[in-house]
């Protein structure tokens, strides 16, 4: 792994951890109630952080290893972009016409053996069609911007690494 690619992955790891902490702070400090799609995006942020950590621990030595790392990091980020885009579409619908976004994660994972440990991460009962704003911008837009930045950064670093 070239120094540039490694630095970029370290940066993505740090930003991902901060984004995950920010999502928890928005819920537990600011009192925002996340919906099912918000929690799905939070899990994609956590998966992105875990993927960057795995790539950093594996230390691929060849360009093909860097390619694997870029693809591995991009998978949860692209998933997060698609979830954010779906939530933005739901929020663009006229009030009362948006479909339900599904059962809460706490209901879905209740029988899971690690539920008690993981429950604070997936707790939330907000409405997916009701937008919450941060600095005047809807939260799914911030989420999509973060995921897009992850994808662009990892592929830029891979392309520049020679």
UniProtKB/Swiss-Prot annotation:
Pfam families membership: DsbB
GO biological process, one term: protein folding
Compartments in which it is found: Cell inner membrane
InterPro entries, per database record: DiS_bond_form_DsbB/BdbC, Disulphide_bond_form_DsbB, DsbB, DsbB-like_sf
Recorded superkingdom: Bacteria
Ranges that cross the membrane: 9-25, 44-60, 68-85, 142-160
Keyword list, A-Z: Cell inner membrane, Cell membrane, Chaperone, Disulfide bond, Electron transport, Membrane, Oxidoreductase, Redox-active center, Transmembrane, Transmembrane helix, Transport
Record protein name field: Disulfide bond formation protein B
